[in-house]
Amino acid sequence: MLSRLSILCTLLFGLALSGAGPAKAENVWIAPDMPFFEYTVRGQTYTIERNQDTNATITGSFAKTSRKCPPFCIHPMKAADGVVTVGELELLEFVADYVETDLGLLVDARLSNWYDAGTIPGSVSLPFNLFDPTGNPFFKPVVSRLGGQLKADGNWDFADAKHLLLFCNGPWCDQSPRAIRNLISIGYPAEKLLYYRGGMQSWLMMGLPTIKPSGV
């Protein structure tokens, strides 16, 4: 059975072939049944397609293979027990199933200077340090925004919490794993958290597009 994502991609590709929409991804598709993918988040429509230049390479800081460890050490595949690790296709499916329907958020957990330099289209900036429950004045408002409700006993009720897919710079970056661990420490359901371990480095390595937030 085709997933909702595959069905959407098939429909979009059919529109492009019929002339009802712009032709996309002539040579480099995302997947065999996915030449490109479009989604609308908070009123903005994004087209995700890979760089069509088969000679393209990564440039800039994400082209580096080695960083001092610690602190930039390779992270395990699993950020925490019960948290599913995903790749690029699962990220797009998450956007289709949860972000477009307002049931979830694609969270860029990096500090704002990284976010401002370029992020995955449709993501929101919620830096990892916002999820530190100790001495952070923004902690309660942020968790409330995610659907958490603070109970009279000081614990959180996450029955209506959003599904979150968190990412940072790559397998060597600790920002999204730290955010995930802090969320779990206050009772956020692990089954509502996903971890895109590849992060920005893998996203760029696949030739996928980034955007700079408006006003930057």
Indicate where each model-derived feature is located.
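Short, solvent-exposed loop/turn and secondary-structure capping segments
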Residues: 117-121, 138, 176-180, 206-207
